[in-house]
Amino acid sequence: MPVAYQFKVTLIHSNPPVWRRILVPEGSLDDLHKWVQTAMGWENAHLHRFDIQRKHYGDPEMLDDGFGETRVIDSLGVQLADLFDRPRPAKRFTYEYDFGDGWMHELEFEGIVDPPRGKKPPCCLEGERACPPEDCGGVWGYAHLLDVLADPNHEEYEQYAEWFPNGIDVEVFRTNEATKAMRQGLPRWGD
């Protein structure tokens, strides 16, 4: 039976919570980034970083602070087994996406499991609510956006309604679409 790692991914401070439960095969921490991106519904248009047990993981060239004070370990070279298939694995850690908007996610490692019948990793087992749109100002900007769209008398309503003519259905989430996205991989930019 192949190894499968199970994680619950929750967008921190989202209310009501936006979350996914994913099952992934052995791979690198960079692969986990790709699976989180696609399961959540992000577009991979910004930088990201994992913070696990007081260490930072990501792309060292992109995340160098210029002062040599923040050491970033290359996520391409770190296997999930290195972090989670050991006596004292990290149980909870964070994943930040888009340092401008500051989308913080808590990842809870739920264990190394046998995949449920009919579920081949990578896949999304369950989740709730739509991913917020990119570049809307983080969790607080998203809440403001939803407030504006809910009030046709709001002074910013026309502008926001132009960007989102059909509104935003925050409750829409389809597990099968998240699984399909996880298997297809990240969007290709510049094609």
Where are these regions (language model features)?
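Short linear regulatory motifs enriched in tryptophan with gly/pro/ser
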Residues: 1-191
